[in-house]
């Protein structure tokens, strides 16, 4: 093994950025094929490639951070900056969706009947499933904070319990959202209301699924004693991401479900 006189991690050549880019191309093309031609072959191929890429890329990172010891405090600091920038980019994504929603709703065009919601649209009741979803996500925010505090205090059992509760609440939220979509009296093709509603809430739902997957990985890593009270960036990143998902939902609830109805 060569002697290293700096704190940085010199990453080995990896195929995963290439396969990740390929999977993104397949997924976006597959989504267009699904919407226009009702064919899910390309989308399924893209999702499969994406899942395999993520699994193997994260496996490599976990190996580098644990067994190979490449994640020095300096490297961890760089990863933290990276996660913060990633969350900022996600904020800008949602800013675009909120912009589209408010641009359409604050000054409805004559084609929409000059009113919001547009003529013929029956909006969902914000005091039913959406309010329950809000409670579920707020509760999950409390449980992820409990998990973080338990980890800092070295209480492994409480950390696992809190993490399991957070994952269960995330899955419950996803199931509630799926049932709401199934029963909604409008679709994504119902003009600007359907488009902005399903794109904004659907993109958020995708983030909940990604966040739940992130937390499930952390749960299994904690079972294998990967985290300590002073070295647990993987969990910290998952917690930051989950709080971001939480805050975005509050804005979605107030804007689209409550004010927009």
Curated annotation (Swiss-Prot):
Keywords: Membrane, Mitochondrion, Mitochondrion inner membrane, Translocase, Transmembrane, Transmembrane helix. It is found in: Mitochondrion inner membrane. GO terms for cellular component: mitochondrial inner membrane; respiratory chain complex IV. Pfam families: COX3. CDD domains: Cyt_c_Oxidase_III. It is a multi-pass membrane protein. Residues 1-15, 67-72, 153-155, 224-232 are mitochondrial matrix. It catalyses: 4 Fe(II)-[cytochrome c] + O2 + 8 H(+)(in) = 4 Fe(III)-[cytochrome c] + 2 H2O + 4 H(+)(out). It comes from the Eukaryota. One of its GO terms (molecular function) is cytochrome-c oxidase activity. Its EC number is 7.1.1.9. The chain crosses the membrane at residues 16-34, 41-66, 73-105, 129-152, 156-183, 191-223, 233-256. One of its GO terms (biological process) is respiratory chain complex IV assembly. Residues 35-40, 106-128, 184-190, 257-261 are mitochondrial intermembrane. Belongs to the cytochrome c oxidase subunit 3 family. Component of the cytochrome c oxidase, the last enzyme in the mitochondrial electron transport chain which drives oxidative phosphorylation. The respiratory chain contains 3 multisubunit complexes succinate dehydrogenase (complex II, CII), ubiquinol-cytochrome c oxidoreductase (cytochrome b-c1 complex, complex III, CIII) and cytochrome c oxidase (complex IV, CIV), that cooperate to transfer electrons derived from NADH and succinate to molecular oxygen, creating an electrochemical gradient over the inner membrane that drives transmembrane transport and the ATP synthase. PANTHER family: CYTOCHROME C OXIDASE SUBUNIT 3 (PTHR11403:SF7), CYTOCHROME C OXIDASE SUBUNIT III (PTHR11403). Component of the cytochrome c oxidase (complex IV, CIV), a multisubunit enzyme composed of 14 subunits. The complex is composed of a catalytic core of 3 subunits MT-CO1, MT-CO2 and MT-CO3, encoded in the mitochondrial DNA, and 11 supernumerary subunits COX4I, COX5A, COX5B, COX6A, COX6B, COX6C, COX7A, COX7B, COX7C, COX8 and NDUFA4, which are encoded in the nuclear genome. This is Cytochrome c oxidase subunit 3. The lineage of its organism: Eukaryota, Metazoa, Chordata, Craniata, Vertebrata.
């Amino acid at each position: 093994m060569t002697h290293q006189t700096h704190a940085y991690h010199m990453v080995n050549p990896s195929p995963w950025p290439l396969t990740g880019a390929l999977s993104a191309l397949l997924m976006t093309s597959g989504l267009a094929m699904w919407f226009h031609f009702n064919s899910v072959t390309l989308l399924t191929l893209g999702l499969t490639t994406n899942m395999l890429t993520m699994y193997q890329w994260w496996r490599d990172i976990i190996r580098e951070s644990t067994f190979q010891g490449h994640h020095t405090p300096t490297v961890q600091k760089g990863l933290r900056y990276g996660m913060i920038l990633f969350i900022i980019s996600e904020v800008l994504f949602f800013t675009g969706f909120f912009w589209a929603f408010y641009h359409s709703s604050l000054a409805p065009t004559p084609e929409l009947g000059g009113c919001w919601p547009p003529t013929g649209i029956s909006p969902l009741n914000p005091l039913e499933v959406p309010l329950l979803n809000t409670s579920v996500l707020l509760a999950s925010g409390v449980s992820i904070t409990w998990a973080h505090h338990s980890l800092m205090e070295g209480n492994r059992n409480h950390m696992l319990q809190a993490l399991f509760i957070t994952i269960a609440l995330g899955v419950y939220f996803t199931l509630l959202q799926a049932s709401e979509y199934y029963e909604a009296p409008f679709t994504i093709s119902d003009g600007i209301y359907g488009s902005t509603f399903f794109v904004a809430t659907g993109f958020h739902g995708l983030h909940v699924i990604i966040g739940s997957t992130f937390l499930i990985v952390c749960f299994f890593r904690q079972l294998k004693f990967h985290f300590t009270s002073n070295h647990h960036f993987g969990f910290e990143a998952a917690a930051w991401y989950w709080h971001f998902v939480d805050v975005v939902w509050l804005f979605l609830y107030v804007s689209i479900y409550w004010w927009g109805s």
